[in-house]
Swiss-Prot record:
SUPFAM superfamilies attached to this UniProt entry: Ribosomal protein S6 (SSF54995)
GO cellular component, one term: cytosolic small ribosomal subunit
Stated role: Binds together with bS18 to 16S ribosomal RNA.
Pfam families in the cross-refs: Ribosomal_S6 (PF01250)
Keyword Oxidoreductase among record annotations: no
Region (Disordered): 94-155
Top-level taxonomic group: Bacteria
Molecular-function annotations in GO: small ribosomal subunit rRNA binding; structural constituent of ribosome
Name used for this protein in its record: Small ribosomal subunit protein bS6
Amino acid sequence: MALYEHIFIARQDVSQQQVEALTEQFSNIIKEQGGQVGKTEYWGLRNLAFKVKKNRKGHYTLVNIDAPHAAVAEMERQMGISEDVLRFITVRVEEHETEPSAMMQSRGDRGDRGDRRGGDRFGDRDRGDRGDRGSSRFGDRERPRRDDNSDGGQE
């Protein structure tokens, strides 16, 4: 059997309990088809990048699945029919993550940014003096000369 990570977004006007019931309903489809459902994470009500079916927010849920392709296809078919599911994506993975996903970790625990305090913030952007590049004023620049004998490109 193959390993999958499945994320779906439920409508903003359903409650968290209804989202958990949807998750259980789709998990039962996988189990009936001979698959197993591993970790399930409810990520909460989050803003969408753009409106999806007239919704600006959605309940995000991650489900780790170990099931044959037919079971995943049936679950996706049922999600497509459901009015409560806005979007979903299923990705095949080599192995499931055992630790909480990045969405469940607190911002400080992720460690994806370096120390942002102190230091020489603009040290790498030192412009120095202008050197021999000329004046900094636009009006002081030398303008190209036009040949007075030209007729503006017309023959």
